[in-house]
Design a protein with these regions (language model features):
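Aspartic protease catalytic domain
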Residues: 22-48, 53-61, 197, 355-454
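Glycine-rich flap/beta-hairpin and adjacent strands of clan AA aspartyl proteases
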Residues: 187-273, 371-434
Length: 454
């Protein structure tokens, strides 16, 4: 009898032990929080109506809350008068419609709802069109239906608002919800739900919002919430993301947590970024034109510029742009009727060779093919025939910001955005029709005469 009792006790004890063991969570994070990588396609060429240089210039100034010059506003108003209110119009482009900006898929909520969003290193806010958005602002966009997400949680007394330089604005309320890029899943991500949307976004039906990849010091929530950059180091094996944007192609990608060595040639060279203003800011040391001339140009004080995947054009410091066009691009001129630099559409300006530096005096070089610069055919009455708005512009004297290096600057290179070490890396990559980019060399080696830009 005693033996039976002891055996029964052992059975009960064993069953209880199994129950205790199975109730203890397995060591390590749950699958949704496991560190993952993601490769997200970057689609271009879908914003068929927005190929207007002055409109892109206006849009960039507005984004950075830079006052809009009256001359530029007149040009944009003239353009918009020809465009139906529910679209952005169709303007002939050279060489084809595309390269306005790259949108990529993201999944939000539970169950997941897929939206195509603009991945933007010039903003810290991740916001979406949703069922909170006023009806008049939704013009064909896919919206995020918060009522269908079981994981959406409203953050009490939290709102967001962005005022643009043209005095338009976007605003709304803030939630936490599950946010996924491929296999990369972030729980409790800050999702800004739009109530009001600026017309510059509501007119783009293919894009359902933005993914902000700048630093949280510039996030526009009140009170301040974590931005995507704050979440990434906790969910990535390596706190980096890379960009491979392609000229007139939808084969580009954003990769998170790893470097795909098949996407570039030679070595990645890094320069430190200044994140004190919340942006990916670097310093432009100088430039040269790849045209056989002996001249290179260097700033007396390196110019602070911002790397921005969310801006279409390449805005270099004013002195550099003027010197490049006046000394190296025949028939280029600044047109007040277009409010920008214009060039013959059938021309191929010389490649723009650039140098970036940082506080530790690291210097890296790269070049933008001149064939990227004929951006949009001028179609206004009185515009010179055969001329195009150039993809290389300056911000002028309207701001202390000296440059915004947008997609035209970024497309020829492969970039690594290193969150942990606060640096950005560049490597050459094959550009059509070439199959290889070749080895990096000193691009200014034959420039024997230096001009100092003040």
């Amino acid at each position: 009898m005693a033996g039976r009792k002891n055996f029964g006790f052992m059975v009960v004890w064993f069953v209880l032990l199994i129950g205790i063991v199975t109730a203890i969570p397995a060591s390590g994070p749950s699958p949704k929080n496991t560190r993952q990588t993601a490769s997200i396609p970057a689609a271009d060429g879908i914003f068929k109506g927005r190929h207007n240089g002055a409109l892109e210039y206006h849009r960039t100034l507005s984004k950075y809350n830079i006052p809009i010059p009256s001359g530029l506003q007149r040009v944009v108003n003239r353009y918009l008068e020809k465009v139906p209110s529910d679209q952005t119009g169709t303007v002939p482009a050279v060489p084809q419609d595309g390269d306005l900006e790259w949108i990529s898929p993201a999944n939000i909520g539970t169950p997941a709802q897929q939206l195509y969003l603009d991945f933007d290193t010039g903003s810290a806010d991740t916001w979406v069109f949703s069922n909170d958005t006023v009806t008049k602002s939704v013009k064909g966009q896919t919206i995020f239906d918060l009522s269908k997400s079981t994981t959406a949680q409203l953050i009490p007394n939290c709102s967001w608002s962005i005022l643009y330089g043209d005095f338009s604005s976007s605003s709304g309320i803030v939630y936490k919800d599950t946010f996924a890029l491929g296999d990369l899943v972030i729980e409790g991500m800050t999702i800004e739900s739009a109530k009001q949307v600026s017309t510059q976004f509501s007119s783009q039906k293919e894009m359902s919002g933005l993914v902000g990849l700048a630093f949280s010091s510039i996030i526009q929530t009140e009170p301040v919430q974590k931005s995507l950059i704050d979440f990434l180091p906790d969910v990535l094996p390596d706190p980096i993301f890379t960009t491979d944007l392609r000229h007139n192609s939808s084969e580009g990608s954003y990769n998170f947590g790893y470097i795909d060595h098949d996407l570039y040639d030679d070595e990645i060279e890094y320069v430190g970024v200044d994140v004190s203003d919340g942006f990916w800011s670097v310093k432009m040391k100088g430039f040269a034109a790849k045209d056989g001339s002996d001249f290179s140009y260097e700033f007396e004080q390196p110019a602070q510029v911002i790397l921005d995947t969310g801006s279409t054009l390449f805005y270099a410091p004013d002195q550099a742009v003027s010197a490049y066009y006046k000394n190296h691009v025949p028939y280029a001129n600044f047109s007040y009727s277009e409010y920008g630099w214009i060039i013959p559409c059938n021309s191929t300006p010389p490649n723009f060779i650039w140098e970036l530096t940082d506080k530790d005096d690291n210097v890296i070089q790269g070049e933008v093919p001149g064939e990227y610069f004929p951006y949009a055919v001028l179609d206004n009455k009185g515009s010179p025939e055969g001329y195009c708005y150039s993809g290389l512009q300056s911000l002028g004297d309207f701001t202390s910001l000296q440059g915004i290096l947008g997609d035209i600057f970024l497309k020829p290179m492969f970039e690594v955005w290193d969150i942990g070490q606060q640096r950005v890396g560049f490597a050459p990559k094959p550009l059509p029709p070439m199959k290889t980019a070749g080895k990096r060399r000193d691009l200014m080696a034959n420039k024997t005469k230096k001009v100092i830009l003040q």
